Structure formats: C-alpha cells, structure tokens
Design a protein with these regions (language model features):
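N-terminal strand-loop element at the rim of the active site
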Residues: 7-14, 30-71
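Conserved donor-binding/catalytic core segment of Leloir-type glycosyltransferases
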Residues: 140, 189-207, 213-218, 231
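Short alpha-helical donor nucleotide-sugar binding micro-motif in glycosyltransferases
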Residues: 269, 278-282
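A charged, aromatic-enriched C-terminal amphipathic alpha-helix characteristic of glycosyltransferases
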Residues: 346-377, 381-384
Length: 463
C-alpha cells in the first residue's frame, strides 16, 4: 500500500523535536519494514536542502507552512496555494493519506482521499480545531485519556457524528541491559558526590522548567553534601518549532532569578541515538510541568533506560502511576517534588528492573507499528452518532482528576476544593444528578460551580 504521511511540523535529518516527531519516524519506518511504500511530506525550513531519508523513508520538505506552533498556517496566500498543490499531488499518489498530528486545514486539497489522522496533543489550537472541524475516516490517539477528551469535546460542542477514535499506545524501546551512562559534550564528567537531575524537554514554561529549577534548588538545600546538577537542553537555534521556547539568554535569566546558577547546566539538543546514554547518566528525570500531555514519552523512556522519573499528575501522565520507577506528585507542589526526587534517587535497582519489564509488556514498539498498520490498511468504517444523554446526568470531565478532597483541572492547572462533590462522584462512579431537589444545598452549590467551570460536563452517548 502507498501511504502518504503528512506532517505540518518540520522534520530534520539529524535531530528530532518532541515526542510526536519521534513517533512519526518510528511508525513510518515500521510500516516500510512491513512492505508498504511510505513517503513523508513536511514543512520546509531554511535548514532544509532538498529531499532526504529518515530510517530509509523518503522525506519531502515541500509544504510552505510557517514551521512553528501555534498559527502554523499564518503564511502568504501564495504559500498556502502551493502547499495545497503539494497535498493534492501527495494524495493522488497515495492509496491512503496519514495526517500525523493532524493540523492540515487545507482539506479541499485532499478531497476524495481516505484519511487516517493521529492527534498527539490537545493543547495547540491546530489539534483542537482539527477534531472539531476537519474530517477524517479514523483518528488514532496514544492514550485513553486523549480519546476521552476528544469524544467529550465533540459531544459537548454539539456535533452529531464522530469518526472511530482508536487508542494505540506509543512504543518505547527497552534495551536488554541498562545503557552506558553518557553525558553530553561539554558537560563535566560525573563526580563522586554528584546528584544529576535531567530535564529532557523543550524549554517552555509549561514543561516545568521553573518547577524543575526550584526543585533542584530545594534538593541542594536538603542535601548540602551532594553536588546537585540539573541538566537542561538548549533549543536548536535553527529549529524555530515552538514560539514559546525561550532563548538561552532568557533561560539563563530565569536560572539566575531562581537561584540555580550553581546547579543548572545547559547542553546542546541531543539526537534520538544519544538519548539512551543520556537517560542512563542521570539519577532522576523531572517531568513536573503543567503541560497537558496526551501520552508523555519522557518518563517511560527514562525508566526504560534505567533512571527513575518524577511526574506531575497531569493529563496522560496519570496513566503511569502504576509503573515502578515513576513517582507521581501533585502539580506545583515543590516540597512534594523535592521529597519524590530524594526517594527516587535512593530507590532500588530491582524497582527499576520491574518498571522496565512493565514497559516491555505494555508499550512495545512492535505493537505500536502493528496497530498503525491495522488501522491504516483496513476497510474504513462510517462515522458514529454522538449525542448528549437524555437523563441530564453530569460526569467528571476527562481533563479533571480527583486528588484527595480536591479536583485538579488540567487546562487551568488549578486545584479546587469540592468536598461534597468529590464524595458524590466517588459513590456514583463519576456521575452526579444536577437536580437541586435531590441534592443538599452545599452539594448543589458545588455542582453548579463545577458545571460553570467545565469540571462537570453533560453525560454523552456514542452509538
């Protein structure tokens, strides 16, 4: 089968920006190895110089979008028209069109094509609008969390139909043995008293840069005899993938403001082949931001390569609570993050090996590729009906989580006290009747407040 993979985000031959682009490379290479003719069309940047291969898959940087998020299509009319022509030619060549991390607004250029898309975030406007406004025959998502967020949003918005939404977990390679620790070029070798913390993320605020620095500073205060080192990758200067990413000068200013000058060390952006040794070089990996992850590769990759991770209980990170070697903490609570780092750093090797075994069985790269092939190559089903339930029940929105007597909202990064509502939701399996005649005055007030904030949404049915 000829498969045209389309990526609005640029792809580069020597490095990968973000987990989504890594998944694209793994999936397309896997499909090619299974005998399919796969080619990728992506956005061109000044760094590109013609076609190239990624793991044997041809890449054509021919789309003339902006190359950074958000507002990917904010280019000239001529650039949009030429991008439409490129999309049309790719669709005419292909048996199936795969829109990776769908953000293709120019759907008229794909008219008549059988479209399978994937969604890998539900934060940027491109992903949100794609699921509400742009047609596809099937949508692939990496987690039940994202599936439920999309379905709830579509139902709540008043749409009457929805395509099949299929969960295919991202695949993570687990080495047979823990890799040899390898620090990046320019970083001093590990010292005897070092406690190395890793922050292998794009340097944007919601990824937890501020929280990571604050946590590292607190760890150093508690462990004055240790030499705490927080390693942070500097964004590639020619990538321009995310407008929210800070420059090195801006990052250094933040480090100084938070008292981390003697703790933080910046290094160059690493290629996928360098990541295993990098993870293995750390004592703990930090994933403690407010970014609403739709899967979150970093903590799983970290444990796979022998290093425990501390994760904020945000978005799809919550699905990793039972993976040994991953410690969940409430977002924004630096004291909890600090204690979790100290606990993780003192954890046993057996715990990490148990986590590695869990990852092998749950997040296999082979299963991921087989799942994508099954969805992309099979006979496509028709859209399903979706509507609000007739009984007027409210349910806890999938982007919210009960944490103690509080409810955390992923999209506002806030935690509010709802003691009566929390008790009712626990008893009624996440549902509540909004009838003031059936509720106490205090519960009714909490229900009304939560409904207004989008914490409670109408129950929906998919036919």
């Amino acid at each position: 089968m000829r498969i045209a993979a389309i990526s609005v985000a640029p792809i580069f031959p020597n490095y990968v920006i973000g987990g989504s682009q890594k998944i694209l490379a793994d999936v397309t290479a896997g499909l090619k190895n299974l005998g399919h003719d796969v080619q990728i069309w992506c956005t061109a940047t000044e760094s590109h110089n013609g076609d190239f291969d990624v793991d044997g898959v041809a890449v054509h940087p021919e789309l003339q979008f902006r190359g950074s998020f958000p507002s990917t299509h904010q280019v000239s009319p001529v650039a949009l028209a030429r991008s439409a022509e490129t999309l049309r030619n790719a669709a005419e060549w292909a048996d199936r069109v795969y829109l990776h991390a769908d953000a293709v607004y120019l759907r008229h250029a794909l008219e008549g094509a059988e479209i399978i898309r994937s969604i890998h975030d539900y934060v940027y406007e491109e992903a949100l609008l794609s699921t509400l406004s742009l047609p596809a025959d099937v949508t692939i998502v990496p987690s039940n969390y994202l599936k439920h967020c999309i379905e709830a949003t579509v139902a709540f918005s008043g749409k009457k139909t929805i395509e099949q939404v299929v969960v295919i977990s991202n695949g993570v390679h687990v080495p047979e043995t823990t890799p040899v620790p390898t620090l990046p070029d320019g970083i001093l070798p590990r010292g005897e008293k070092d406690l190395i913390l890793l922050f292998p993320h794009r340097p944007i605020p919601t990824k937890g840069l501020d929280e990571a620095i604050r946590t590292a500073v607190e760890v150093q205060k508690i462990e004055p005899t240790r030499n705490v080192r927080l390693l942070i990758p500097a964004y590639p200067t020619n990538a321009n993938f995310d407008d929210l990413a800070g420059s090195t000068d801006e990052l250094m200013e933040l480090v100084s403001d938070l008292g981390g000058v003697d703790i933080v060390e910046f290094h160059s952006w690493l290629s996928p082949t360098e990541m295993s040794g990098y993870y293995a070089s750390g004592d703990v990996t930090l994933c403690i931001g407010s970014f609403v992850e739709s899967f979150g590769l970093v903590p799983i990759e970290s444990v796979a390569n022998g290093t425990p991770a501390v994760c904020a209980s945000v978005g799809a990170f919550r699905q990793f609570a039972d993976i040994d070697g991953i410690i969940p903490v409430p977002y924004g609570q630096i004291e909890a993050s600090t204690q979790a780092v100290l606990s993780a750093a003192g954890g046993s090797a057996d715990l990490i090996e148990s986590g590695r075994s869990q990852i092998i069985h749950t997040y296999s790269p082979e299963s991921m590729v087989e799942g994508y092939e099954s969805v992309i190559s099979r006979t496509l089903s028709e859209a399903r009906k979706i509507e609000l339930a007739a009984d007027d029940q409210l349910l806890l929105a999938p982007w919210c989580d009960i944490q103690g007597q509080e409810i955390y909202d992923d999209y506002t990064a806030t935690r509010l006290q709802y003691p009566h509502l929390v008790s009712a939701l626990k008893v009624n399996l996440g549902l509540v009747w909004p009838d003031p005649l059936l509720l106490s005055a205090s519960l009714d007030a909490e229900v009304r407040h939560a409904k207004e904030r989008g914490i409670l949404i109408p129950k929906y049915v998919i036919g």
